[in-house]
């Protein structure tokens, strides 16, 4: 059971959103082994997740893991975190970027290097761009084609709940 704590519930800091000190301790109230892990440390997160998976596979039940991380950006594209977050808040977050942390660890361990990193970054960028271009062949938000509004009710439920069915019928009026 993973709870990703990025420290913000939209614009409310997690300290104000919970009565406890951590989200991990909530699992203890249900007698579920609970852990808190640095979500920006790939190796720590992998280790804890593997331990919990092995524990579950051995029939020992669930493990509650609080993945403590930092939301560097806004909650959504319409969110302006500068309104409710101090400008220097990110400086208080130890460890920094998880991708950079893992890269630096692997380089120090001589398991990775700048040449491979640059090549992989280019390959990923190329794949993303190719996928984007392929998707644009089906249309985009600027030029369409646009599916009918009624499609918001399709391909979601195997059996449409009554309240959704009512909304669907209301749309047709």
Question: Model regions: which residues?
Answer:
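Glycine-rich ThDP/TPP pyrophosphate-binding loop and its adjacent helix/strand module
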Residues: 1-140
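C-terminal intrinsically disordered, low-complexity extensions immediately downstream
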Residues: 137-173
């Amino acid at each position: 059971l993973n709870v990703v704590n990025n420290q913000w519930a939209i614009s409310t800091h997690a300290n104000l959103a919970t009565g406890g000190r951590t989200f991990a301790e909530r699992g203890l109230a249900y007698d579920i082994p609970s852990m808190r892990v640095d979500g920006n440390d790939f190796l720590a997160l992998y280790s804890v997740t593997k331990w919990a998976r092995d524990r579950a596979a051995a029939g020992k039940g669930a493990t509650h893991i609080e993945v403590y991380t930092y939301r560097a950006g806004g909650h959504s594209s319409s969110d302006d975190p500068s309104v409710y977050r101090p400008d220097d808040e990110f400086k208080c977050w130890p460890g920094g970027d998880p991708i950079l942390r893992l890269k630096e660890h692997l380089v120090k361990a001589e398991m990775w290097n700048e040449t491979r990193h640059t090549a992989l970054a280019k390959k990923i960028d190329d794949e993303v761009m190719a996928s984007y271009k392929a998707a644009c062949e089906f249309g985009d938000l600027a030029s369409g084609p646009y599916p009918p509004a009624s499609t918001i009710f399709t391909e979601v439920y195997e059996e449409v709940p009554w309240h959704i069915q009512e909304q669907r019928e209301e749309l047709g009026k």
